[in-house]
Amino acid sequence: MEVAKTRYKIMADALRKSGRNISFGICEWGDRKPWLWGAQVGGQLWRTTADIRDKWKSLQPVKNARELHGTGAGILDILDYSLDYAAYAGPGHWNDMDMLIVGLYGKKGPSGDLGGVGCTDTEYQSQMSLWSIMNSPLAATNDVRKMNAETKRILLNEEVIAINQDALGKQAVCKIKNESWNVFVKPLANGDFAIAVLNRTDGSQNSKINFADLGLNGNYEIRDLWEHKVVGKGKKWNGKVKSHETKLFRLKKI
């Protein structure tokens, strides 16, 4: 770790001396826990895991994050190994969950290695939702000259991007975590909250979210950021979530 810290600090110092505003991303794949020291040595973002592949999850079980180098990390793997680092993120220093694979559809190349056979549009939309609420830098890697309608819809959703770019800079915290569900809460600069509801299972499920269970008391207006409309008001949300889908809501106190 100390060798890595020394080397990255040398690079950060050189970038500062250039007199230009340059973002410095630390990439050692999370092996040396850069969230603990990345900002200290001058980094603005640091990778949390092995490289992402174009798939939902690793097809082989892994015991720790390092094993993802061999099995290939999918969307769900990177999410799971990035849940505990919210305290280290904020304006000017971010946990980088790697690139967006939205719209790749199994394209050959590094993203297609280690079982990267592609994802469904539902899974790509989930990545956009999850990376946004987790404040990960958003870097599209598809060919923007040849985007289909679904890829454009996912990548260009201004309401979703606004959650990622919110000035408060708070990373979401996972309030519910089990084999079937993840539920995330992220406070926003204007007092609203973003909530993401991920169905981890291979089938559609009905979900009932009581906002009080998430630490949010009172009544809220519930806006679905993918449907672009208000879908309810009150102290809870009920609805169906498709397999591997992530619902993303903005809650406004009423």
Task: Please annotate each region the language model reported.
Residues 1-30:
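Extracytoplasmic, non-cytosolic globular domains
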Residues 1-9, 32-37, 56, 205-206:
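Extracytoplasmic/secreted cell-surface and envelope-processing proteins
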Residues 20-138:
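Glycan-recognition surfaces
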Residues 125, 131-134, 139-141, 177-216:
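Carbohydrate-binding surface patches
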Residues 126-175:
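Catalytic cores of secreted or luminal carbohydrate-active enzymes
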Residues 195, 222, 244:
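Hydrophobic, well-ordered secondary-structure elements that form the walls
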Residues 212-227:
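Solvent-exposed beta-hairpin/edge-strand motifs
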Residues 232-254:
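C-terminal beta-strand-rich structural cap/linker in extracellular carbohydrate-active enzymes
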